[in-house]
C-alpha cells in the first residue's frame, strides 16, 4: 500500500475511534423524469460526517448535491463513485469546486473505465447535456479496497472491480445497488453485450438478495422508491425476459415490441430501443 493509499484509508477510517455508534442515515437525490437518466446519488451520514455515493450526470444536478450536502450540516469526508458510466461522475465539477479538499475515490476498474471512455462519452453526451455538460471531467483517485468506514460503521464494496459493483451497509441492512439495480423503467443493457456479461449480472443480483437487505436503493429508478428487495427482483426478472426475447428476435424492433408487451407500463423506452440495437448488433456502443 502506497503512502497515498494509506492516507486515503486513514481518512475513511477516521471515525473508528467513536465510542458510541450513531445510526447512519441515507438521503437519496434522483432527478426523476427531469433527468436524462434518473440516477441515484446517496448521502450517507453519521452524527457529524458524511460520504457521498455517486455524483449525477450533469452539473446542474451536481449543484443540487452541493446544496443537499450543505443543508445536511455534515462534514463531507469523501465522494465515492461506484460506476464508470458518465451519469455517475459527470456531475463532479460543482462538487469539487465546493469541496476542494475532499477526495473523489473509485475502484481501480472504475477509474480505468473512466479514463478509457470519458473523452468519447463527453463528445457524445456534451451536446445533449448542453449547459449542464461539464467543462472539465474529473477522474477519481484509485481506492481499491472492499471496505471503508463512516464514524465506525463499516461500508462494504461488493463485486469490487466488476460492472455490477454495489455497496452494502450491514448495520442498517441497506444496499446501494449502483448500476446493477433498476426500478420503474426499462433496464439499460447496452453496456452488457454478451450472455456471459448478463449472466454475471444476474449472479450479482442473487448474491445481493442473499444478504437479506431491509432496503435496496436502485442506481436508477423512476416513480416511488421500491420497498425491500423489489428492485432486485424486478431487475433479475427483466434480464431473464430480455435474454429470452433476444434469443428469438430477428432484429431490434422485435426485441422492443416483445419487451414492451411484457412490461407495458415501464418508462424509458428510448433506453430499451438503444439497448436492443446494441445487443442485436445493429449499433455500436
Predicted segment positions?
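Bacterial N-terminal signal peptides that target proteins for export
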Residues: 1-9
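N-terminal signal peptide c-region/cleavage motif recognized by signal peptidases
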Residues: 17-20
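Conserved beta-strand hairpin/beta-sheet module of binuclear metal-dependent hydrolase folds
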Residues: 23-71, 166-179
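Active-site environment of divalent metal-dependent phosphoester hydrolases
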Residues: 36-38, 59-61, 84-89, 111-114, ...
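Metallo-beta-lactamase
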Residues: 57, 115-233
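Active-site metal-binding motif and surrounding structural segment of the metallo-beta-lactamase
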Residues: 60-105
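Accessory terminal helices/loops
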Residues: 210-215, 223-285
Amino acid at each position: 500500500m502506497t503512502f497515498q493509499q494509506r492516507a486515503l484509508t486513514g481518512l475513511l477510517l477516521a471515525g473508528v475511534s467513536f465510542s458510541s455508534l450513531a445510526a447512519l442515515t441515507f438521503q437519496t437525490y434522483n432527478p426523476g423524469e427531469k433527468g436524462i437518466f434518473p440516477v441515484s446519488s446517496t448521502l450517507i451520514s453519521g452524527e457529524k460526517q458524511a460520504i457521498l455515493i455517486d455524483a449525477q450526470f450533469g452539473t446542474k444536478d451536481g449543484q443540487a448535491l452541493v446544496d443537499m450536502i450543505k443543508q445536511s450540516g455534515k462534514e463531507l469526508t469523501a465522494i465515492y463513485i461506484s460506476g464508470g458510466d458518465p451519469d455517475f461522475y459527470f456531475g463532479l465539477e460543482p462538487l469539487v469546486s465546493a469541496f476542494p479538499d475532499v477526495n473523489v475515490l473509485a475502484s481501480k476498474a472504475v477509474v480505468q473505465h473512466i479514463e478509457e471512455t470519458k473523452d468519447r462519452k463527453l463528445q457524445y453526451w456534451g451536446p445533449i447535456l448542453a449547459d449542464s455538460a461539464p467543462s472539465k471531467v474529473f477522474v477519481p483517485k484509485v481506492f481499491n479496497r472492499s471496505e471503508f468506514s463512516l464514524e465506525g460503521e463499516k461500508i462494504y464494496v461488493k463485486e469490487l472491480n466488476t460492472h455490477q459493483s454495489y455497496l452494502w451497509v450491514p448495520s442498517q441492512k441497506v444496499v446501494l445497488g449502483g448500476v446493477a439495480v433498476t426500478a420503474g423503467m426499462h433496464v439499460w443493457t447496452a453496456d452488457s453485450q454478451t450472455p456471459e456479461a448478463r449472466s454475471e449480472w444476474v449472479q450479482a443480483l442473487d448474491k445481493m438478495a442473499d444478504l437479506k437487505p431491509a432496503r435496496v436503493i436502485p442506481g436508477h429508478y423512476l416513480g416511488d422508491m421500491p420497498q425491500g428487495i423489489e428492485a432486485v427482483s424486478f431487475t433479475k426478472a427483466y434480464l431473464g425476459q430480455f435474454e429470452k426475447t433476444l434469443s428469438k428476435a430477428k432484429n431490434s424492433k422485435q426485441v422492443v415490441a416483445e419487451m414492451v408487451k411484457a412490461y407495458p407500463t415501464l418508462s424509458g423506452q428510448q433506453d430499451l430501443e438503444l439497448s436492443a440495437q446494441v445487443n442485436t448488433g445493429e449499433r455500436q456502443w
